[in-house]
Regions:
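Secondary-structure transition/capping motifs at alpha-helix termini
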Residues: 166, 186-187, 319-323, 341-348, ...
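Conserved short alpha-helical segments that host acidic/polar catalytic motifs at enzyme active sites
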Residues: 2-258, 263-322, 328, 416
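Flexible loop/turn segments at secondary-structure boundaries
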Residues: 44-46, 122-123, 153, 223-224, ...
Length: 514
């Protein structure tokens, strides 16, 4: 049975703690998932991991963490908040100094490898116990794990191992993976990690840190991105997005293949398949629409170019006479520029974000939410007053904050508001790593476009078609059939009759004590 190393075995330094903070409600409609990073053999690996996470901060802002090894011991640090809050200069120095677990003496052995994680929770609450990487002792040694995705059979697996006497310290699906790896069934296999991954159902891009190596793995469907790169000195690195590799001066080599485990060690890069890739892949198209950095190259395309193409296609599908094309900051900018270019309507920015609002509201009331939205986005009255506007946004989930934004434009004197959305209506929940609301909270679930238009108070509303979206995302290497559109179409690649909702592991613990 694995034991959490934080209470014993490896003394962690007393580090500066960032305060836990909830996020502004308007950001909760569509949440980023997580980012992972790993490097082996590179001098300054701690700093590289820090910058690799910093470059992927858009994928998760609830917590961050890092684990390092000197070839003998593992040391980890996690905390709630942004990367720059969790890792102070003192924190990074402590990780680089590597306290020896026996006597706390400073080791002269250089750091051999590191992995990192920044998180938005999709299974397990936003609590410090769920921050990653998780560092555990088990019969095979010590391991640290960081995960992007969602294991839909995590609750069933946790039930199984609790009945066998395993003790869990968190409510995330990632800890379930560690218990699987530690079990005798997997440890008796010639490839314990591969045997572990074959037991998982769902989406995962993971990095594992052992004393002598980093291992990176991706599920057979390829839901979440994971890329392999190389530093100028030849040392290997992995990350969720290519933007992280660019930030540290690494060269992108290739994607980690679906069903593949890539090992980074002193022997270089080694590869093995733990499962055959699915015949029909399931690359998350919402990565192109919203989640990924515009600067990343993902699923065969540069994200910025995909988003501009989404806007161009939207202009062809839903033309309208207007004075200006206006983006909803920040995620609507790329599509709005494409719409303006294809339509010939001038591009103007009349909605200005206040970047200093959004992370200090703790459990706001509805009145506070409304005020927060007004503070978050300021309307330039002289630009919008008396004008017919095409407002472009990437998506609508619940619709309440979109309505508030449209009310602001109307109050500022906009003559007409034509809302254009660069993806189809989101009608179904995601069980594979995106924190979409339940069906009854999705505004497009069992509602027509006209009903949504009336609720939002706009003059016209159009969503991009699924076909138009896939035409923009697809490439010769990744044709349209290899993208997951379940949140739009309900076409799930795996059986989700009994899916694992985000809070299922918390509810299980509450039942135990009720």
């Amino acid at each position: 049975v694995p034991n959490r190393t934080r209470p014993r075995s490896i003394p962690l330094p007393v580090l500066d703690a960032a305060p836990a903070r909830d996020f502004l409600a308007e950001d909760s409609e569509k949440k980023e998932k997580c980012a992972v990073f790993g490097v082996w053999g590179e001098p300054g690996g701690v700093r590289l991991t820090y910058w690799g996470l910093y470059a992927q901060q858009h994928r998760g802002q609830e917590s961050a963490g890092m684990a390092v090894t000197d070839g003998d011991h593992l040391l980890g640090h996690t905390g709630m908040g942004l990367v720059a809050e969790v890792f102070t200069e003192r924190t990074l120095w402590d990780l680089e100094a590597r306290p020896d677990r026996r006597n706390g003496a400073r080791s002269a052995t250089p750091i051999r490898g590191a992995i990192g994680h920044c998180r938005y929770s999709t299974t397990g609450a936003s609590l410090s116990c769920n921050a990653q990487p998780i560092v555990e002792n088990y019969i095979g040694g010590t391991v640290a794990v960081a995960h992007n995705g969602n294991i839909i059979n995590a609750s069933l697996l946790r039930d199984l191992y609790e009945q066998k006497g395993h003790i869990f310290h968190s409510t995330s699906d990632t800890e379930v993976v560690v218990h699987l790896l530690a079990s005798p069934e997997q440890q008796s296999s010639p490839d314990p990690l591969g045997a572990t991954l074959r037991r998982l159902q769902g989406a995962f891009s993971m990095v594992f840190l052992f004393p002598d190596r980093v291992e990176a793995a991706r599920d057979p469907w390829g839901w979440r991105p994971l890329v392999l790169g190389e530093m100028p000195g030849g040392h290997p690195v992995v990350a969720s997005e290519t933007v992280a590799l660019d930030a540290i001066g690494a060269t992108t080599i290739r994607d980690v293949r679906p069903g593949e485990i890539v090992t980074l060690s002193d022997r270089g890069v080694e590869s093995r398949q733990f499962a055959e890739p699915a015949e029909r892949r399931a690359h998350c198209v919402f990565e192109h629409v919203y989640f990924a950095s515009p600067a990343s190259h993902l699923f065969g395309r540069t994200v910025q170019l995909v988003r501009e193409a989404l806007g161009e296609t939207l202009a062809k599908e839903a033309p309208v006479d207007a004075d200006y094309v206006m983006p909803m900051p920040d995620s609507g900018r790329s599509a709005a520029s494409g719409y303006a270019r294809a339509s010939g309507i001038p591009y103007r920015e009349g909605i200005v974000p206040n970047r200093y609002v959004g992370r200090t509201f703790i459990k706001p009331t509805q009145d506070e939410r409304t005020t927060a939205v007004r503070l978050k986005l300021n309307i330039v009255g002289e630009i919008v007053r008396g004008k017919r506007l095409v407002v472009v946004d990437d998506s609508i989930v619940r619709g309440t904050t979109t309505r508030a934004k449209m009310d602001q434009l109307r109050a500022a004197g906009a003559k007409e508001i034509h809302l254009r959305i660069s993806c189809p209506p989101i009608k179904h929940p995601c069980y594979f790593g995106v924190d979409f609301a339940t069906r009854d909270q999705l505004i497009a679930h069992e509602r027509s476009v006209e009903e949504i238009r009336k609720f939002l108070g706009v003059d016209s509303l159009h969503f991009l078609s699924i076909e138009g979206m896939l035409e923009c995302s697809a490439s010769a290497k990744f044709p349209a059939e290899h993208f997951c559109t379940a949140c739009y179409s309900g076409d799930y690649r795996l059986d989700v009759e009994q899916p694992a909702p985000k809070g299922i592991l918390e509810r299980r613990q509450l039942k135990m004590f009720s």
